[in-house]
Amino acid sequence: MVAVIIKGNEVAEKKRAQLKEEVVKLKEQGIVPGLAVILVGEDPASRSYVKGKEKGCEQVGIYSELIEFPETITEERLLAEIDRLNGDDRINGILVQLPLPKHIEEKAIIERISPEKDVDGFHPISVGRMMTGQDTFLPCTPHGIVELVKETNLDISGKHVVVIGRSNIVGKPVGQLFLNENATVTYCHSKTQNMKELTKLADILIVAVGRPKMVTADYIKEGAVVIDVGVNRLETGKLCGDVDFDNVLDVAGYITPVPKGVGPMTITMLLHNTVESAKRAGVVCK
């Protein structure tokens, strides 16, 4: 058995086409979804991510605004800019590109964003709503992962999901989203002693640890859905995931590649959240 490859880039394109249609309808009502992205400093990776977000906005018809600051900006000035954007009716979503310089407290910045414009889903209020199953903006990468699993037409309810990784960005929230879908969820991490025994029980295995090709075929239950969140650059310059793709291919039922797997879904779900925010606000732009 050779695994079916879940092509995240194709799923993302399909969802972006749907979003584009939604944006056209909103514009007919005088509503233009708007996303503001704040970039601090000159980090090449951050700039690359921001460029991808701008391109995504352009693709679906979302108004985007890039606000750039030098690395020397004070926390007070950055907070003031967020306050301004919170009060700007043209802006439905505010995203601060992380990481920030060490002298700025990320927690304070994230918590200053209005929960109604928290399209990253990082605000504690958004997290609390997600944990209790309330309607909220879901964090983009975890939301994208759930959507990719749904593409397999597997009924998630009652399935055993194992998550390797417990970060606040991916690991913890993705487990909660699967719990909200009535799955049974197990977390594995660096202190887990019997990891392979646990992962071999997984109907759905999510790997998000940042260790190149860590997960091999002996971690996988035959026919499992394997979602590889890791993006690692090898010495050769080639990108690879946390899963040894070629090694696992003959055991898994479904698997995401790296690149063109989870990555394209992250920005797509950000666009989705921005459009949803515009619908909720319902502000007609003049």
Curated annotation (Swiss-Prot):
The record's section on SUPFAM superfamilies has: Aminoacid dehydrogenase-like, N-terminal domain, NAD(P)-binding Rossmann-fold domains
Q: Which PROSITE patterns match?
A: THF_DHG_CYH_2 (PS00767)
PANTHER family, sorted: C-1-TETRAHYDROFOLATE SYNTHASE, CYTOPLASMIC (PTHR48099:SF5), C-1-TETRAHYDROFOLATE SYNTHASE, CYTOPLASMIC-RELATED (PTHR48099)
Question: Which catalysed reactions does the entry list for this protein?
Answer: (6R)-5,10-methylene-5,6,7,8-tetrahydrofolate + NADP(+) = (6R)-5,10-methenyltetrahydrofolate + NADPH; (6R)-5,10-methenyltetrahydrofolate + H2O = (6R)-10-formyltetrahydrofolate + H(+)
- Membership in a protein family: Belongs to the tetrahydrofolate dehydrogenase/cyclohydrolase family.
Function summary: Catalyzes the oxidation of 5,10-methylenetetrahydrofolate to 5,10-methenyltetrahydrofolate and then the hydrolysis of 5,10-methenyltetrahydrofolate to 10-formyltetrahydrofolate.
> Per UniProt, where does NADP(+) bind?
G165, R166, S167, S190, V231
Gene Ontology molecular function, alphabetical: methenyltetrahydrofolate cyclohydrolase activity; methylenetetrahydrofolate dehydrogenase (NADP+) activity
Write out the entry's keywords from A to Z: Amino-acid biosynthesis, Histidine biosynthesis, Hydrolase, Methionine biosynthesis, Multifunctional enzyme, NADP, One-carbon metabolism, Oxidoreductase, Purine biosynthesis
The annotated subunit structure for this chain is: Homodimer.
Report the GO terms under cellular component: cytosol
List this protein's GO terms for biological process.
L-histidine biosynthetic process; methionine biosynthetic process; purine nucleotide biosynthetic process; tetrahydrofolate interconversion
Underlying gene: folD
> What is the name listed in the Swiss-Prot or TrEMBL entry for this protein?
Bifunctional protein FolD
In which pathway is this protein known to take part? One-carbon metabolism; tetrahydrofolate interconversion
